[in-house]
């Protein structure tokens, strides 16, 4: 990854700092918390979904939902190509991404995981992520901004891995 690409990723990530004093963990329901705590997590799960799409060469689902709970209680989770839950093998990486204390640490985690998992970054697969939501808290989660940032991030990841 060249310096310009690293700067773009770091700049994008610096818009979504993780909440202080909160440690999130990926489980059956994905990441669950009050909507006010999930902005950085949703952004980082977008990265996770993009990497999962590259690894599986399939469409990945990303959902914001907790329809059976009070409105402020939200979750963000990934659906694998089969429609099932995210592979348990990827959950520790999901936890690490969500809890990375800085954009620099986030970048390091991404680079290490791509290498460890042998994720093909040769540019012959276009990332495909479907986003669904069922909650009124989408505005609180900054989806308009996040969607723009995620699209920029996906494009950045594509450029990085094609070079």
Task: List PLM regions with ranges.
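Gly/Ser-rich phosphate-binding catalytic loop and adjacent alpha/beta segment
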Residues: 1-163
């Amino acid at each position: 990854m060249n310096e310009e690409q690293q700067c773009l990723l770091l700049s994008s990530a610096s818009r979504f700092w993780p909440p202080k004093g909160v440690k999130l963990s990926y489980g059956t329901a994905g990441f669950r918390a009050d909507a006010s705590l999930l902005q950085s997590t949703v952004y980082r799960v977008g990265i996770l979904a993009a990497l999962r799409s590259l690894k599986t060469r399939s469409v990945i689902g990303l959902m914001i939902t907790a329809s059976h709970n009070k409105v402020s209680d939200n979750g963000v989770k990934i659906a694998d190509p089969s429609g099932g839950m995210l592979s348990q093998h990827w959950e520790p990486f999901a936890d690490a991404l969500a809890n990375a204390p800085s954009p620099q640490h986030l970048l390091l985690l991404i680079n290490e995981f791509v290498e460890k998992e042998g994720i093909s970054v040769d540019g012959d697969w276009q990332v495909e992520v479907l986003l669904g939501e069922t909650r009124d808290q989408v505005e609180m989660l900054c989806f308009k901004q996040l969607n723009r940032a995620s699209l920029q991030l996906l494009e950045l990841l594509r450029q990085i891995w094609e070079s």
